[in-house]
């Protein structure tokens, strides 16, 4: 656990890595944590006020040098589906 001085410092610490599989935020303000995770955290997964194993119902995967793509959950199933575009003249 690394203590940050403010939100900007927390995001600098969290994103200062070439990897981006997952991270976590521990705080009493869960609404703020959700905003930070959604808008500023550069990882594929973020846990708020917890750490643990991956949930098979949630997408699992990272960004940056941790790779791209997702496993598990609905997003994981899309890795095994080929989308086809079919065009009709209007």
Question: Predicted regions span which residues?
Answer:
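Conserved C-terminal structural/oligomerization subdomain of aldehyde/semialdehyde dehydrogenase
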Residues: 1-90
């Amino acid at each position: 656990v690394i203590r940050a001085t403010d939100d900007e410092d927390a995001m600098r610490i969290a994103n200062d890595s070439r990897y981006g599989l997952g991270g976590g935020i521990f705080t009493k303000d869960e609404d703020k944590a959700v905003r930070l995770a959604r808008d500023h955290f550069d990882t594929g997964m973020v846990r708020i006020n917890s750490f643990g194993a991956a949930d098979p119902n949630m997408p699992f995967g990272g960004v940056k040098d941790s790779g791209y793509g997702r496993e598990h959950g609905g997003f994981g199933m899309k890795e095994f589906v080929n989308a086809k575009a079919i065009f009709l003249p209007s």
